[in-house]
């Protein structure tokens, strides 16, 4: 079972995420690589919204393959190309939509660029299930 710590005495999170998650003796852990916005046919959508959908739908497929759900995600690391930092609300909205109200520990970092110039974002998650 995973649950958020309230962070007594700390500032509230800046968005819909948890400051820390405790996993009570998980029997299985899933660590993804950075998931990038490449569709199964090898294309990369142009818009940030479409890239976020590709990334998060890929993460959901991996969770399903591991017999897990979004509620099992304990940590999210998101990288967004700095030139597109004005689209962070789009990235965060996609995350929230795919998590369905679940809050995980989350770090969002802007970077000068990713490996391929058409990639605008990349997400890695850790999930724990009992």
Question: What function would you assign to each model-found segment?
Answer:
Residues 1-74, 80-130:
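N-terminal presequence-like segments and the immediate start of the first folded domain
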